Amino acid sequence: MRTYLDLLQHVLDNGTDRGDRTGTGTRSVFGYQMRFNLEEGFPVLTTKKLHLRSIIHELLWFLKGDTNIAYLKENGVSIWDEWADKNGDLGPVYGYQWRSWPAPDGRHIDQIANLLKMLHGNPNSRRLIVSAWNPALVDEMALPPCHCLFQFYVADGKLSCQLYQRSADIFLGVPFNIASYALLTMMIAQVAGLKPGEFIHTLGDAHIYANHFDQARLQLTRIPKKLPTMWINPDVKDLFAFRFEDFQLEGYEADPTIKAPIAV
């Protein structure tokens, strides 16, 4: 994951110090792209240990179309706690937009199901897109989508994904986003009868919070290790049938976690 460390170093060295919504302050650049070849291993950080349980359960929660944190809490995942209301609701966030985008005529559009149909029927389509950014509902969301649009591309029997992320918390959020969308690409490739290709991560406002600078510098002193591999249960052919037990990260060796505060 030298690619990720290069991003950390680039922003620390070349970023602009700016204010932000949380009042914490950031150092940021605008426009940055990383590429990960999924045939070379699963792109999860080895210079600090990540809580993969949270990443997998959050992705399954998105795919369920769920917007209440009850499922996450039941599975020991707390990453959305700060934004939920007293009933655990988050408003029409990612899962709702992915699986139940509201149309003007009253219909609800299942973007993920439509994507799967297009992959089977017209894999060369340039419309293999899912959007979580719904301007009509942004103000009703507990947190507007940071990773807001992704597109798939099929070539030579391989499925690649490009994600556009409007707001990228490099130290805490981006490592989760890389692993999550890499896994989503692998899952969709499997059910579509394809092999995983690349995950391309395009960042808009790519920032390190001021109270993460020391942690970022510590991480930059560490040497990346060999990437692990992600085993996915080959018997699962339905994207919505995946369960936590269908995934196993093999050969994951990582340095200790580095704690940092969340900017809310």
Curated annotation (Swiss-Prot):
GO CC entries: cytosol
Keyword Acyltransferase recorded: no
Q: In which pathway does it act?
A: Pyrimidine metabolism; dTTP biosynthesis
Could you tell me which InterPro entries the record lists for this protein? Answer: Thymidate_synth/dCMP_Mease, Thymidate_synth/dCMP_Mease_dom, Thymidate_synth/dCMP_Mease_sf, Thymidylate_synthase, Thymidylate_synthase_AS
What Pfam families is this protein classified in? Thymidylat_synt
Binding residues for dUMP, per the UniProt record?
Answer: R21, R126, R127, R166, S167, A168, D169, N177, H207, I208, Y209
Coarse class of the primary localization is cytoplasm
Superkingdom per UniProt: Bacteria
The UniProt entry, under PROSITE patterns, shows: THYMIDYLATE_SYNTHASE
GO MF, any single term: thymidylate synthase activity
Q: What is its EC number?
A: 2.1.1.45
Its annotated compartments are: Cytoplasm
Extract one GO BP annotation from the record: dTTP biosynthetic process
The chemistry this enzyme catalyses reads: dUMP + (6R)-5,10-methylene-5,6,7,8-tetrahydrofolate = 7,8-dihydrofolate + dTMP
Q: Which residues form the active site?
A: C146
UniProt keyword list: Cytoplasm, Methyltransferase, Nucleotide biosynthesis, Transferase
| General function of this protein | Catalyzes the reductive methylation of 2'-deoxyuridine-5'-monophosphate (dUMP) to 2'-deoxythymidine-5'-monophosphate (dTMP) while utilizing 5,10-methylenetetrahydrofolate (mTHF) as the methyl donor and reductant in the reaction, yielding dihydrofolate (DHF) as a by-product. This enzymatic reaction provides an intracellular de novo source of dTMP, an essential precursor for DNA biosynthesis.
Return the similarity comment.
Belongs to the thymidylate synthase family. Bacterial-type ThyA subfamily.
How this chain assembles, per its entry, is: Homodimer.
Which HAMAP family would you find in this protein's record? Thymidy_synth_bact
- This chain belongs to the protein called Thymidylate synthase
- UniProt source species: Brucella anthropi (strain ATCC 49188 / DSM 6882 / CCUG 24695 / JCM 21032 / LMG 3331 / NBRC 15819 / NCTC 12168 / Alc 37) (Ochrobactrum anthropi)
Phylogenetic classification of the source organism: Bacteria, Pseudomonadati, Pseudomonadota, Alphaproteobacteria, Hyphomicrobiales
Q: Which gene encodes it?
A: thyA
